[in-house]
Amino acid sequence: MTDVTIKTLAAERQTSVERLVQQFADAGIRKSADDSVSAQEKQTLIDHLNQKNSGPDKLTLQRKTRSTLNIPGTGGKSKSVQIEVRKKRTFVKRDPQEAERLAAEEQAQREAEEQARREAEESAKREAQQKAEREAAEQAKREAAEQAKREAAEKDKVSNQQDDMTKNAQAEKARREQEAAELKRKAEEEARRKLEEEARRVAEEARRMAEENKWTDNAEPTEDSSDYHVTTSQHARQAEDESDREVEGGRGRGRNAKAARPKKGNKHSESKADREEARAAVRGGKGGKRKGSSLQQGFQKPAQAVNRDVVIGETITVGELANKMAVKGSQVIKAMMKLGAMATINQVIDQETAQLVAEEMGHKVILRRENELEEAVMSDRDTGAAAEPRAPVVTIMGHVDHGKTSLLDYIRSTKVASGEAGGITQHIGAYHVETENGMITFLDTPGHAAFTSMRARGAQATDIVVLVVAADDGVMPQTIEAIQHAKAAGVPVVVAVNKIDKPEADPDRVKNELSQYGILPEEWGGESQFVHVSAKAGTGIDELLDAILLQAEVLELKAVRKGMASGAVIESFLDKGRGPVATVLVREGTLHKGDIVLCGFEYGRVRAMRNEMGQEVLEAGPSIPVEILGLSGVPAAGDEVTVVRDEKKAREVALYRQGKFREVKLARQQKSKLENMFANMTEGEVHEVNIVLKADVQGSVEAISDSLLKLSTDEVKVKIIGSGVGGITETDATLAAASNAILVGFNVRADASARKVIEAESLDLRYYSVIYNLIDEVKAAMSGMLSPELKQQIIGLAEVRDVFKSPKFGAIAGCMVTEGVVKRHNPIRVLRDNVVIYEGELESLRRFKDDVNEVRNGMECGIGVKNYNDVRTGDVIEVFEIIEIQRTIA
């Protein structure tokens, strides 16, 4: 046969070249794809494959035996029980060499066992023969001794009977010899029978041990048998034992089986442990072997704690957390108590608390983000457009009445400041101004202390902060706060020193004061530009605009003009005719009329857009503030505004945010710490002022709520029962009536239905347009709830000149009033060497012999002190009264 290549052989065998090369390598032949293969190498490969693909290495045999057992019952009735015994044996094929070795070992073992058995039988025979011989010799000795005794006794008899006795003795001797021979024969037979039984027993034991060694040591075949018994009583278990012995050993019910069977009357004599052992023996053991050990629990306690990966969402109940850690809920509650938090098993806890508890208990925490839908919606946007320069967003900040809005009015050439209630700004105004050098967007923030959050929001949404400081007033508290907001937001500051036209203006003082807070002018080596302006005369306005544009040019402000818009809510309110209205500052992209927007918890389609002049616009680019209509509700000021593609997904995200906010809020409200519990217990009675607040815009609601809550003291607390944007409705009036609250309207009015409820319930309704007045009146209401302060006021002093004894009043002090007036029934103190030794009240006050109500300065009188007789000459009696002083909220 000619040699062929690997490729040709692979094509003939219909296999791949790589597999064929691997098969040759397994057979011990190294080949490559282009090598030739000889006939001998082919045969070697075929032998290798045949040997590899030989028959199965394991054979399993199963056997099932069924039997029926009749059990006698009460009343003469018998009960049939079906018994089924299942057995399974597995035979493992071995290698020929291993099989030969095991066969040789088995043959050697069998020979050794046979030799041991023969030696045991011979030894048993020898022992039995020696024993029989010893017993026969002893018997003969005893008989000889008895014969000798009888012969001696016979000699004493009468001589005439000697012949007869001799004959009888000879006959008796013959008979005894015959009996001795018979006894010897029986003893030999008994010894031989015992020897045979002993030999059989030893042989049986040796054979059984050999079989056990063969099945346990050689491991061929391996046997895995399991018995499944259906038992109903102790009789059934006994029958199962007998059936197992018949099936496994092939032996009948012999004497041993009968001996093993208990007697009928013995059923109750067995102890509980014996019955448990018998039951365990019936059911236990591989290969049908019975074990006498009692039942044992198979579970063992883990050697160390199991650390798990616990996945925690934004909120989770205590019970769910315990299930994730595979522990009891009580253990989680104990761990939370150690951390200082009280909770029940069904209470919702936030993610941070759950993480602390899980890590405290030694588990690894995986925080799960549940806002995949929100991320998917927010990431589905038009991106990739080139960034273009945009107009700067400038926030005007400063102290109240320093001229921020007036300065902006001059720039816009309008009269906005005169329209504000009280002449102070209470909203964020957003405007954009076209100048010769470009467009600028201005945000005008309030300067009053109550509007801290508005100023912070304005600083976050801005590029440049213009800090307005009055030259005649200098740095004030809100000026410092504006500097802090600007530094926190990381935006540059341009200082406008206003009211420079006033005679008392001092710009250098402003520079010195601002330098203490890190605002240094450029001429002093700092980074802030200082511009002197006058909002009234218009001086320095152009320089201020140039400084703003110069700062914007340094910042290189850019934004993507094309694509889907995003921005922030500057202000929001509820218009009675138009619905929810939000002032939005666009940051990037272009906002079109008809776009679908997602804004915090609200969503909707933009139905209309207006600029700050009230004119309709169709689109708004970066840095342009517009009012949008069409949202599902009033958004919170500061919320992100994003244009999305799908209104359905926007609705789902908004609803998800609402539900998640509610869950997180509930979890935080329920979190009760031990120290808070004890503080509430010791707090005692606290008066509350309940308020239902309605305002025109969201920012005002936020500012007023913060200001009112800060008024709370340890004795009087302010609770905002309800708040919202828009007019006062019937629902608000009903809520105020139910909670005994004050209705407060800030720049809003109550409708007709609400007024009817207010009149019927006699509710306290108050309207305000300036935040100063609102806060002052709430302070007055809280002051009326404060308990008055008690103050002791000394009204007179009397010096003891002499002491008299009275049978009715005891010791009477004769006194001279040295100061003020002494009144009867007023509390007094007795002073000795300027030390108070007694405090009580006057019982008797007399001038001469007449009782009087009061004695004035310079007059003598007799004073009887109630329940006190230790009055001495030289003591001073101090008379005082307690007056109430009404407290006020600071």
From Swiss-Prot:
Chief location category: cytoplasm
Composition bias, Polar residues: 67-81
Binding site for GTP: 398-405, 444-448, 498-501
Sequence segments annotated as region (G4): 498-501
Disulfide bond entries: none
Chain residue ranges for the region called G5: 534-536
tr-type G domain ranges (all copies): 389-558
Compartment(s) of residence: Cytoplasm
Region (Disordered): 45-304
UniProt GO molecular function: GTP binding; GTPase activity; guanosine tetraphosphate binding; translation initiation factor activity
N6-acetyllysine PTM positions: 808
A GO CC term assigned to this protein in UniProt: cytosol
Residues covered by region (G3): 444-447
Annotated Pfam families: EF-G_D2 (PF22042), GTP_EFTU (PF00009), GTP_EFTU_D2 (PF03144), IF-2 (PF11987), IF2_assoc (PF08364), IF2_N (PF04760)
UniProt entry tagged with the keyword Nucleotide-binding: yes
Biased composition (Basic residues): 252-266
Chain intervals with Basic and acidic residues compositional bias: 92-217, 267-280
Chain intervals for the UniProt region annotation (G1): 398-405
Region (G2): 423-427
Biological role: One of the essential components for the initiation of protein synthesis. Protects formylmethionyl-tRNA from spontaneous hydrolysis and promotes its binding to the 30S ribosomal subunits. Also involved in the hydrolysis of GTP during the formation of the 70S ribosomal complex.
Protein family per UniProt: Belongs to the TRAFAC class translation factor GTPase superfamily. Classic translation factor GTPase family. IF-2 subfamily.
Protein name in the entry: Translation initiation factor IF-2
Gene it is expressed from: infB
